[in-house]
């Protein structure tokens, strides 16, 4: 097995896939703790459906680099989703359901009406659940992922204390002069960036798992925000690497294998919590 891994690591596309996988896992887990604590977990699910709709439009328009179209559309929808959720007539969960289901339906409709290839079901399945496209990345795509990942990490580090305050008590944050609405907007925009980055890795339907599972796993062991965030990052990166290597060796779907690794990590953390609690 070790020899087989060394053999595969000799290929540039495998190294590119591991780099992108680690960066995506890092970014998604950084914000995951905040989204779970703020009960924004499903915003990732909603934006992933929006990204699916944007990808369908890009496919119909024959846009060569669809990332340049999907990214701004998802960011704009993240802002609209946040603004709509603050509307007293439409609550947050209803706004997410409305936008996500609408984008998913319109995207699938466009792919049916303006089918660009003979294998429609394969294209849809690939978009929803991820594909081997992570193993066919070009160096330009890797650099784009690196740049966006650096942006996400820098924004999180620079505004860490503000995000911390807004996460736990918006009323207190406002009382201390923090513009909570601006930082909620920042969280939504960063989430949109992460969603777009993760689409090639796990597909639009499984993206939420990368955000939620590492955070929930870390919360089983640690109770301090910083410790939970660090643990979440470590678990997410380890699960991404192990999932991708197992996928390469066993020939299983990349996204599903990574999510399965996250589930196993969550179950192990739950066992550790029970054992520690028993003592």
What do these predicted regions represent?
Residues 33-48, 52-118, 218-230, 247-251, ...:
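Short loop segments and helix-boundary regions at transmembrane helix junctions
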Residues 137-214:
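Helix-loop-helix "hairpin" substructures at the membrane interface of multi-pass membrane proteins
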Residues 20-28, 54, 58, 69-77, ...:
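Alpha-helical transmembrane segments in multi-pass membrane proteins
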Residues 1-26:
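Membrane-interfacial amphipathic/re-entrant helices at transmembrane-helix boundaries
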Residues 255-259, 263-279:
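Cytosolic-side transmembrane-helix boundaries in multi-pass membrane proteins
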Residues 18-23, 67-72, 94-98, 142-147, ...:
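Hydrophobic alpha-helical transmembrane segments
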């Amino acid at each position: 097995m070790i020899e087989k891994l060394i053999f595969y690591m000799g290929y540039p596309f495998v190294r590119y896939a591991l780099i992108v996988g680690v960066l995506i896992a890092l970014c998604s887990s950084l914000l995951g703790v905040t989204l779970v604590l703020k009960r924004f977990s499903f915003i990732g699910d909603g934006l992933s459906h929006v990204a699916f709709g944007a990808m369908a439009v890009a496919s119909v328009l024959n846009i060569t680099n669809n990332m340049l179209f999907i990214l701004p559309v998802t960011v704009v929808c993240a802002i609209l989703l946040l603004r709509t959720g603050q509307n007293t007539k439409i609550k947050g969960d209803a706004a997410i359901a409305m936008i996500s289901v609408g984008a998913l339906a319109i995207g699938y409709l466009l792919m049916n009406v303006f089918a660009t290839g003979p294998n429609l079901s394969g294209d849809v399945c690939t978009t929803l659940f991820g594909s081997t496209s992570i193993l066919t990345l070009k160096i330009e795509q890797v650099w784009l992922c690196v740049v966006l990942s650096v942006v996400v990490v820098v924004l999180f580090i620079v505004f860490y204390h503000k995000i911390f305050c807004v996460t736990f008590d918006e009323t207190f944050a406002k009382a201390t002069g923090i513009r909570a609405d601006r930082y909620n907007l920042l969280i939504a925009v960063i989430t949109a960036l992460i969603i777009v980055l993760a689409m090639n890795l796990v597909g639009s339907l499984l993206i939420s798992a990368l955000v939620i599972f590492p955070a929930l796993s870390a919360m089983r062991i640690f109770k301090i925000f910083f410790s939970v965030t660090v643990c979440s990052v470590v678990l997410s990166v380890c699960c991404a690497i192990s999932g991708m290597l197992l996928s390469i060796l066993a020939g299983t779907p990349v996204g599903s294998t990574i999510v399965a690794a996250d589930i196993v990590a969550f179950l192990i953390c739950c066992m550790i919590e029970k054992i520690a609690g028993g003592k």
